[in-house]
């Protein structure tokens, strides 16, 4: 997946459009976590240092009606960015119009501008998320070069990524996007072996396509989380009150047949009568889950089994928790697996976003992984072997 990057274009005196991912959590107008802004800094600084004018834009939350706009402005983001960069950042409170055009035309080399939430264009006919050609053309007209650095929306064809790129403007990847393509793309297309995938989370249905694609690619697939119970049921075991997708049992059976001994399931399970951190819990073999209890985590023996399967791995991709990670009594499986991956030597270790990323960060292991993906949905689709529209629209090298 050889794509042109920001280093392949001359930025001096150029108006550089940068689609960033500034979709940060806001509470009462205050940013509660600025990770995504921090993650975009290398690309933004590169534009500034190389004499370009940085015109930044992003979506923030979902906006369908006028009322939805409340609390979704990028203004607090522009203010935080200014603090992080140590220089003024101009904020333009519109997505198109004279004020925006004038502000862009008045920029000097090294200046930074942020314009309003791209999804404000969805209020009147889904122009952003429907990839309205006219809107893409308008945004493209504001710049000379387009840098797509928003991997989190790479699996969507929106006006602010695909729409702009399809006008023919030179389109390259920013540093964040480049890193995602390098790590996840490589793992799927050309992994160093042995390649072990660890999949968790609640539903088999969310991961079917990933499992199908990885059966061909991975040497082992370790399954934990709520989705494991559908596989156990497919083996003919009772799963008690555990999360179960009845309509996916036959599919789980056929996936197991296809995978053979590549697929590894939990050998023991932590069960409880209630979905509560205060309820008593104990560990049983996975083949003996009581009818009146539900599985909420993988047991100690499974943590050990998974850690053994990981020994010697050269590429590891982890997506999804092993249990109900939000409850401390049922977080041990996720923590155990996270530690086992973090302590591997000489392996490329990748977390595919979402809850697994939160777990690694919470445990202070973020620097022990080769790569923690910024895009949950996008990284899943890449693991499924799909072509992502946002990636496809970046110029090839």
UniProtKB/Swiss-Prot annotation:
It is found in: Cytoplasm. It catalyses: (2R)-3-phosphoglycerate + ATP = (2R)-3-phospho-glyceroyl phosphate + ADP. Substrate binds at residues 21-23, 36, 59-62, 119, 156. Pfam families: PGK (PF00162). Keywords: ATP-binding, Cytoplasm, Glycolysis, Kinase, Nucleotide-binding, Transferase. GO terms for molecular function: ADP binding; ATP binding; phosphoglycerate kinase activity. Pathway: Carbohydrate degradation; glycolysis; pyruvate from D-glyceraldehyde 3-phosphate: step 2/5. ATP binds at residues 207, 295, 326, 353-356. Disulfide bonds: none annotated. The gene is pgk. One of its GO terms (cellular component) is cytosol. It comes from Enterococcus faecalis (strain ATCC 700802 / V583). Monomer. This is Phosphoglycerate kinase. Its EC number is 2.7.2.3. Belongs to the phosphoglycerate kinase family.
